[in-house]
Design a protein with these regions (language model features):
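Short amphipathic alpha-helical interaction/hinge segments
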Residues: 143, 200-203
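ATP-dependent adenylation/nucleotidyltransferase module used to activate substrates
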Residues: 6-169
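Short, intrinsically disordered, charge-biased short linear motifs at domain edges
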Residues: 1, 164-167, 172-181
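Acidic-residue sensor for enzyme active/binding pockets
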Residues: 2, 36, 194
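Glycine-rich nucleotide phosphate-binding loop and flanking beta-alpha elements
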Residues: 120, 199-200
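Short cysteine/histidine-rich metal-coordination sites, predominantly Zn2+-binding motifs
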Residues: 181-182, 202-212
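Local cysteine-cluster metal-coordination motifs and their immediate loop/turn environment
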Residues: 98, 174-197
Length: 212
């Protein structure tokens, strides 16, 4: 019994679906929400998993991040570059996981999955192992049913995740990465760069349509 909260790496947990009861997307006003959420819904429907979208529009109003300020505000370059720190939405995972944990307990579900990965650690504090450990402990301590937060990809790369997805037969053309949220992947932002690298590392033909 699991609850799941789609990008390239997010697709993987729902294809290991023997326990998953619910998929959650959060619409928090990011540039790419409108591109990413339909893919999440599509994959859940294909696998017979209930999917819901929760509106967190207030984050766009009160939180500071280039991810919430339009495509032109998104920096280009690699995830490791300092300028990519502008894409951090403060405590985003903490907020979303807290909501998911509450929904899990309300439905007597025992686990909440998150698909953060090793490449996130450089700039996203709420993707790091110490954060995952802390919120897992908080979830267990703060719920009657001892909800646990499960983050199986915390210490592996996006390329390794892509390799697992390849074995599961996932079509990565049916996922979204680009932070700019245009009609096509821009090919230059941090997530696009890492997407290209991950697919190449896994030996997967990249059929993504890039602007450049």
């Amino acid at each position: 019994t699991e609850i799941y909260t789609l990008s390239l790496h997010d697709a993987l947990p729902i294809y290991k679906k023997d326990e998953i009861a619910l998929g959650i997307s959060f619409n928090y006003g990011s540039n790419h929400n409108e591109r990413e959420i339909p893919f999440a819904k599509m994959h859940c429907e294909r696998l017979g998993i209930k999917h819901i979208t929760i509106d967190l529009g207030f984050m766009h109003q009160y939180f500071k991040s280039s991810l919430l300020e339009g495509a032109d505000a998104i920096p280009e370059g690699h995830y490791a570059d300092d300028n990519m720190k502008s894409t951090v939405v403060p405590f985003r995972n903490g907020i979303m996981l807290s909501i998911a944990i509450g929904i899990a307990e309300s439905n007597n579900l025992k686990k909440v999955f998150i698909a953060n990965h090793g490449g996130d650690h450089t700039i996203y504090p709420d993707c790091r192992p110490e954060f995952i450990k802390a919120i897992d402990e908080a979830a267990e301590a703060g719920t009657f049913v001892d909800v646990r937060v499960v983050a199986p990809y915390t210490n592996i790369t996006k390329g390794q995740i892509a390799e697992i997805g390849k074995k599961l037969g996932i079509d990565y053309a049916e996922t979204w990465s680009c932070y700019k949220g245009g009609e096509k992947h821009c090919g230059k932002c941090g997530t696009c760069v890492e997407r290209k690298e991950a697919l190449a590392e896994a030996g997967i033909e990249d059929t993504t349509e890039y602007e450049e």
